[in-house]
Amino acid sequence: MLTNPSQVIIRNQETLSQHKVLVLNHEADLLPKALLDVASSVDALALDYHHYLHLAPQANNKLRCYFGHQLPHQNKYNTVIVYFPKAKPLAPYLFNLAAQHLVPNGQLLVVGENKGGIKSLVKLLPNYFAAGVKLDNARHSLLFGSSLIDTAPEITLSDWASQYQLSTPQGNITICNLVGVFSEKHLDQGTELLLSHLPTLSGRVLDFGCGAGVIAATLLKAQPTLSLECIDINAMALASCELTLAANGMMAKVYPSDGLAQTSGKFDGIISNPPFHDGLASTTNIAQRFVADSAKQLQSKGIWQIVANRHLPYSDTIAAEFGQLTVPAENNKYKLYYFQQS
């Protein structure tokens, strides 16, 4: 089953005949594989690890699948397809990345849902591309076309990051946020509540949904001997976390994971501001899976602490998995949940 934007690409796939194609920021479908009906080869770069895992089993000698914020090579393509990101500040980065991999006068296709911000494309497209032209309007989605008319600046990741100083009892921490990462340029209220009530941890600790590494850096500033692992599903978040740790001279294992699937073994501590804030059924299911899985991966005497929107129905799930738990702090928006394994 193809998403609506992918269906619009298929409607216009004749423009890709015998092209070497790169698909950036693809969705959780098999559009890159479907394009092999017309394209000579397709490479796909996912910025969402779940999307990568969905496509990766289809890889072959004509379809190569990657996860990350950049490709591991400098290959050039006749066409680059960009899925317009839900986080609009990420769009200029994706256009710059597309330009790095296009042949001169190569074709840029940008697709996205009508309500997803793509209508602002004309203002966002850099001047090394020709003015965007609307090619199709269907399936509640828009498709724009352009071409590479000038040389784009090289991508330096730090140029796409903002920084701010976070004050902690142990001293200031530098937080690095890449474009499109949650709570860019400031500390969100949920994390602020969590940081003001950090537990004392030891041993192997997991930061689930690490984002830009705010929790990780604060933990390591206060408790530098921790063996910390930071996981996220978002490539830009993982890269931000690595930048934050490097900026503060800290070390942690940073890697992608779909839920807890790519972690192994048990942890002495699990701490998180989990990225489950929209209340959608699908998101709630992911949150419930995280709670259940994390309960299984907590060592004896291990500590589990998360912050969550107080209006979301997580209390019952948490109580069902952990039984007796404590609420160390709450405000009108967020609630802190704490549990220590027996």
UniProtKB/Swiss-Prot annotation:
Keywords from the named record: Cytoplasm, Methyltransferase, rRNA processing, S-adenosyl-L-methionine, Transferase
UniProt entry tagged with the keyword Cytoplasm: yes
Superkingdom assignment: Bacteria
Pfam families reported for this sequence: MTS, MTS_N
Catalytic activity: guanosine(1207) in 16S rRNA + S-adenosyl-L-methionine = N(2)-methylguanosine(1207) in 16S rRNA + S-adenosyl-L-homocysteine + H(+)
Subcellular location: Cytoplasm
E.C. no: 2.1.1.172
Function: Specifically methylates the guanine in position 1207 of 16S rRNA in the 30S particle.
Quaternary structure, from the entry: Monomer.
Sequence similarity: Belongs to the methyltransferase superfamily. RsmC family.
Protein name: Ribosomal RNA small subunit methyltransferase C
Protein's organism: Shewanella oneidensis (strain ATCC 700550 / JCM 31522 / CIP 106686 / LMG 19005 / NCIMB 14063 / MR-1)
Gene name of this polypeptide: rsmC
